[in-house]
């Protein structure tokens, strides 16, 4: 497990590549856990009370996973598995738009780091990403995520002690 960014640095930097090599060598997944957003993105959330678990954690961690996918981490390491909580930090619900706009961005050549991938973002979520429902004990969301990613990609987890709802068990 790693707490998302490290002092504002993300795992898509080449500096962190040995972590991924080691994970693939020992066939172990990486769990990216939310952390407080870095200073560069927390300001507008903090002043509105949207930092932390209410919104900020998910946005920051979802962005981190998306940065890894779009840099081609799963093209470089096809067997790598990455886990995130909170129903995939909302990425499963954005898949159509993520795929569409990523492909449009690649075609436009507007962003230097946005390159073609071997698969769609949706395909990577179905083969290389595992999610837990921690903090999201809401049946419609769980069923949607299972439908989009596959039942074998969605795991149960309780966000204890931060969110404890005995009925969800």
Language model: regions and residue ranges:
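Inter-helical turn/loop segments and adjacent helix faces that build the functional surface
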Residues: 10, 76-82
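H/E-rich (His + Asp/Glu) clusters that bind or coordinate divalent metals
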Residues: 34, 46-70, 81-169
């Amino acid at each position: 497990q790693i707490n998302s960014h490290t002092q504002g640095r993300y795992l898509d930097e080449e500096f962190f590549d040995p972590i991924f090599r080691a994970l693939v060598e020992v066939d172990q997944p990486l769990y990216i856990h939310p952390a407080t957003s870095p200073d560069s993105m927390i300001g507008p959330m903090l002043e509105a009370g949207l930092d932390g678990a209410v919104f900020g954690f998910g946005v920051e961690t979802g962005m981190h996973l998306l940065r890894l996918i779009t840099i081609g981490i799963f093209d470089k390491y096809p067997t790598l598995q990455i886990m995130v909580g909170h129903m995939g930090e909302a990425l499963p619900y954005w898949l159509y738009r993520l795929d569409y706009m990523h492909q449009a961005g690649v075609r436009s050549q507007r962003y230097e780091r946005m390159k073609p991938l071997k698969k769609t973002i949706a395909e990577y979520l179905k083969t290389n990403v595992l999610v837990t429902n921690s903090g999201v004990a809401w049946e419609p969301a769980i069923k949607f995520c299972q439908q989009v990613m596959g039942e074998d990609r969605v795991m149960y987890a309780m966000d204890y002690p931060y969110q404890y709802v005995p009925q969800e068990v």
